[in-house]
């Protein structure tokens, strides 16, 4: 049986650490990638097609899309939805980066045997604790794992282990290089956070210089000089970093409008009456997205949770929804095409008059408003074909 390894990723954006991860994996590599909205509650810096192209250029064989109701979820639900998609495509292994060197297969075995007891333990914990805090206490209680508060990949890896329990998937943890959310562009392996910050900083400086020299600015979010980041990005995809990009600033006026005029925010996914009141009050004074998050979050409602809630509000995600039955393909190599042939009835390669997932497609329409240079994200788009593998 051929080894087929799944990777769950955002590639926001793709960098040398991601290239390193792909290079450590043998056999066929299937990536389940977030579309245009991220797990931490933010729009992707580059659209899903650009990021899929980056992944294919650096060794992925098949890139499929996580629907927005999976990609913008908390860790456990994000992991569960992504693992289910990959398992449906026949993966034998799941690879991921982690700051920890523990055996995640043992963790999955523990959860398979004691999962019901572990979930009951979470329910017994005090309500004032956030869900991530409850989850960490659960892992500590049943496995002895310790957390230092600065291991986000380790937290996700535990969610993957939980999602993979009982599914006959071998878990392959690859030691992470570089710091996950470091804001500094260190030599070699820079974090996605640092790259996003640097990209927008460079763009602002470029636009200021352009205006000072009386040159026309066709788009405020296009970067042409990539020399400052070339040492931190795989050479094969450096040019793609000049693609149109966006961030929350582009959507904040839309979000303000939505919060102000919607009299029933509690009908939005995971928004309750308490949060609705807090949001209605905070939006009157918040000058930007970060200020709004700062004013709304509490110990119980973490910043990450608030960012996701604001994403649900902007995208009008209802409390009840169904996940799409088919899997949307963004791109494939020659090897990946063989996997598609084996899963013909499970995949959708082109979205036309018959929709794939209405919520994701509407979310993509809103995403397109973030930059006038974004192309149509779904209707008529065909998967990217890579000739590399």
Swiss-Prot record:
Ligase recorded as keyword: yes
Domain of life: Bacteria
Catalyzed reactions: cytidine(34) in elongator tRNA(Met) + acetate + ATP = N(4)-acetylcytidine(34) in elongator tRNA(Met) + AMP + diphosphate
PANTHER family, per the entry: TRNA(MET) CYTIDINE ACETATE LIGASE (PTHR37825:SF1)
HAMAP family given in the database record: TmcAL
Family: Belongs to the TmcAL family.
Official protein name in the record: tRNA(Met) cytidine acetate ligase
Organismal lineage: Bacteria, Bacillati, Bacillota, Bacilli, Lactobacillales
């Amino acid at each position: 049986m051929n080894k087929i390894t799944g990777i769950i990723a955002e590639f926001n954006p793709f960098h040398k650490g991601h290239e390193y991860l792909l290079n450590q994996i043998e056999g066929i590599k299937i990536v389940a990638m977030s579309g245009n909205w991220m797990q931490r509650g933010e729009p992707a810096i580059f659209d899903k097609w650009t990021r899929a192209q980056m992944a294919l250029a650096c060794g992925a064989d098949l890139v499929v899309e996580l629907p927005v109701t999976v990609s913008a979820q908390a860790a456990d639900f994000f992991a569960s939805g992504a693992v289910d998609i990959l398992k449906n495509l026949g993966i034998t292994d799941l690879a991921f980066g982690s700051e920890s060197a523990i055996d995640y297969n043992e963790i999955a075995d523990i959860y398979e045997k004691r999962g019901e007891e572990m979930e009951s333990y979470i329910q017994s914990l005090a309500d004032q604790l956030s869900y991530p805090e409850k989850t960490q206490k659960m892992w500590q209680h049943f496995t002895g794992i310790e957390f230092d508060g600065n291991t986000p990949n380790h937290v996700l890896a535990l969610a993957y282990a939980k999602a993979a329990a009982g599914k006959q998937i071998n878990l392959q943890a690859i030691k992470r290089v570089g710091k996950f959310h470091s804001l500094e562009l260190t030599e070699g392996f820079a974090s996605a956070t640092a790259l996003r910050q640097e990209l927008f900083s460079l763009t602002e400086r470029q636009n200021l210089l352009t205006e000072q020299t009386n040159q026309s600015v066709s788009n405020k979010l296009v970067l042409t000089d990539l020399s400052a980041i070339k040492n931190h990005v795989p050479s094969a995809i450096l040019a793609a970093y000049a693609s149109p990009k966006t961030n929350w600033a582009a959507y904040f006026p839309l979000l303000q409008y939505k919060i102000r005029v919607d009299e029933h925010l509690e009908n939005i996914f995971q928004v309750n009456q308490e949060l609705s009141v807090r949001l209605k009050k905070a939006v009157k004074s918040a000058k930007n997205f970060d200020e709004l998050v700062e004013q709304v979050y509490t110990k119980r409602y973490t910043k990450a949770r608030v960012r996701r809630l604001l994403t649900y509000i902007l995208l009008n995600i209802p409390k009840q929804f169904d996940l799409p039955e088919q899997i949307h393909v963004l791109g494939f190599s020659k090897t990946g095409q063989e996997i598609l042939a084996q899963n013909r009835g499970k995949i959708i390669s082109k979205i036309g008059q018959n929709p794939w997932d209405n919520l994701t497609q509407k979310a993509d329409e809103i995403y397109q408003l973030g930059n006038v240079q974004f192309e149509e994200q779904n209707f008529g788009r065909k998967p990217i074909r890579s000739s590399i593998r």
